[in-house]
């Protein structure tokens, strides 16, 4: 796996699923391929994106700044600086300085990532802030190692939280989660279907599913009534894809 592929993988792992994630993935691909060279416009676009947490925006801003060539005097962006200040915690800053000294002696991506993984996400973000604010300089490879370690720490905690929700025995939470998944699956089906004639059927199924979820929420239904809703939708989507000559079995 190439270095930039690895960076893209780690960064996207902390972005919530949805149309915005696809858009960010495209921007990252363009930046890494050298197709997008307007850092100013890129940062303005990032700043105004909804849903993303300030820290995720900070990390993406850091990656864009590392990758896109820019004039030396280009102004640092406040939204990135604020996100990478370790919540203003002096302990994070102390640890970030210690980490920075170690990273300065490192030259490889994997070496930097290994060192960084033993620090908390707050200290890692602060260390990125030091580099972003030009208070410290490391090689681009080392900076990317720091980015990936930070994303791994964040993704780990997101995964633990997600696992807790999936494993919950509370029927109301499980019911709502199934309805949310069915609704987002229906939305994805509508986007994938496009405008071909064969798409009408898939669109109809997706539309009915969304109406059904709305009705279930409006009248309040038994928690078990949502069981299998998303899987039924995915089966419909796969049947539609087969007719279109597309074989993709890995949705579940």
UniProtKB/Swiss-Prot annotation:
Residue ranges of the region described as RNP-binding: 165-252
GO cellular component, one term: membrane
Compartments reported by the entry: Virion membrane; Host nucleus
Protein topology in the membrane: Peripheral membrane protein
Keywords: Host nucleus, Membrane, RNA-binding, Viral matrix protein, Virion
Source organism superkingdom: Viruses
Biological-process GO terms, alphabetical: viral budding from plasma membrane
Protein name (Swiss-Prot/TrEMBL): Matrix protein 1
Native source organism of the sequence: Influenza A virus (strain A/Udorn/1972 H3N2)
């Amino acid at each position: 796996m190439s270095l930039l592929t690895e960076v893209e993988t780690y960064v996207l792992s902390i972005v919530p699923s949805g149309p915005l994630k696809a858009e960010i993935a495209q921007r990252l691909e363009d930046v890494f391929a050298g197709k997008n060279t307007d850092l100013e416009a890129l940062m303005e676009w990032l700043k105004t994106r909804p849903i993303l947490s300030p820290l995720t925006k900070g990390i993406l801003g850091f990656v864009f700044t590392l990758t896109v060539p820019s004039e030396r005097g280009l102004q640092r962006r406040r939204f990135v600086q604020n996100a990478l200040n370790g919540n203003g915690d002096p302990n994070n800053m102390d640890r970030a300085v210690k980490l920075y000294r170690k990273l300065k002696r490192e030259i490889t991506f994997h070496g930097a990532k290994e060192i960084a993984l033993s620090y908390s996400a707050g200290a890692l973000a602060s260390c990125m802030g030091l580099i972003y604010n030009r208070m410290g300089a490391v090689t681009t490879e080392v900076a990317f190692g720091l980015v990936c370690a930070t994303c791994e720490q964040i993704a780990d905690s997101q995964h633990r939280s997600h696992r807790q929700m999936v494993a919950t025995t509370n029927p109301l939470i499980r019911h709502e989660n199934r309805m949310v998944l069915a609704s987002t699956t229906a939305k994805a089906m509508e986007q994938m279907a496009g405008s071909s004639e064969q798409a009408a059927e898939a669109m109809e199924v997706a539309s009915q599913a969304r109406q059904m979820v709305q009705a279930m929420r409006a009248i309040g239904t038994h928690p078990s009534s949502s069981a299998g809703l998303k899987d039924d939708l995915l089966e419909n989507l796969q049947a539609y894809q087969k007719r279109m000559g597309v074989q993709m079995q890995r949705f579940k």
